[in-house]
A protein has these predicted regions:
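Active-site-proximal alpha-helix that buttresses catalytic centers in soluble enzyme cores
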Residues: 1-288
């Protein structure tokens, strides 16, 4: 005899999947294309797909231009052509965009975002652009994890929340000018609340900014400093973080990379753009 269908609040929710014909999610990857940036982007895309089965996730490189690393413009042009082919078969126009572009950036970088918008315009795809991933509490969690992995902060294995730190001052390193530093400062306040130590944001792409920030922290009483990159990774040249940390006389953690929250925030931005309601955890809201 068939099992009776559950009802009420204990009923198992219907599995979430991408709607048929939903726009492609195109991850805009900055920086010089490499096997490392491709691997990272593929892992982030995989996280997004695992949260939303059926998601058409693609990768476009802002500085790409060949089959191995296709440019953002080329990926969007192809998505638009595929949408047009579907419209011809269906005999009716698709009301939505061909793609939604999500920048793989923790914070704003106006010069890079201008290039992304230009690629979108050149493609003629009518694609939509989401916000960058931060500021967000989950990025503060990711920074905490990277610091703990480097031995620069103790990890609370139960909840990763409000614990003592091995460093008594944190420099949050970003790129993208004053706007990026201000945005990083918001996540920095969240990180400071978690670790109970001062956190100041500084620009990696401004000469001497990291060293000046280190001196500011030391002048306020901090001695054991740590540099935490508020960066996904591909947007900066190899060795830049290490060089800045050495100049400032402090240890450094790894970039955020393909931490799980990064993939969930990518999906959350996409879902908000196309009107898909995600479960709480997939929306990038910390679960307490």
């Amino acid at each position: 005899m068939p099992r009776a269908r559950q009802s009420g609040r204990h009923r198992r929710p219907e599995p979430l999947a991408a709607p048929e014909g939903a726009p492609a999610l195109v991850l805009a990857v900055p920086g010089t294309p490499s096997s490392a940036s491709r691997s990272l982007a593929e892992e982030v895309s995989s996280i997004a797909r695992s949260e939303l089965p059926g998601l058409d996730a693609r990768i476009g490189y802002v500085d790409g231009g060949d089959d191995e690393f296709p440019s953002l413009e080329a990926v969007l042009t192809r998505a638009a052509a595929e949408q047009k082919a579907r419209e011809d078969v269906d005999g009716r126009p698709d009301p939505g965009p061909a793609a939604v572009v999500v920048p793989l950036l923790a914070g704003p970088d106006s010069a890079l975002l201008r290039r992304i918008r230009q690629a979108m315009m050149n493609s003629g795809s009518g694609a939509e652009l989401t916000d960058v991933l931060g500021p967000h509490p989950l990025l503060a969690e990711a920074l905490h994890v990277r610091l703990s992995e480097a031995g620069l902060a103790r990890a609370d294995r139960a909840r990763l929340f409000t614990v003592a730190t091995a460093a008594d001052g944190i420099i949050l390193a970003t790129v993208g000018g004053d706007e990026a530093v201000q945005a990083a400062g918001i996540t920095g306040m969240l990180l400071s609340a978690r670790l109970a130590v001062p956190v100041l944001a500084a620009a990696l792409d401004e000469e001497g900014a990291i060293s000046r920030t280190a001196e500011q922290l030391r002048g306020s009483g901090s001695q054991a400093l740590a540099l935490a990159p508020y960066l996904i990774g591909p947007e900066i040249a190899d060795g830049l973080v290490g060089a800045a940390a050495a100049e400032a006389g402090c240890a450094s953690a790894e970039a955020l990379g393909a931490y799980g929250a990064v993939g969930r925030l990518v999906l959350s931005n996409y879902a908000a753009s196309v009107g898909i309601t995600l479960p709480t955890q997939a929306q990038g809201v910390p679960v307490r």
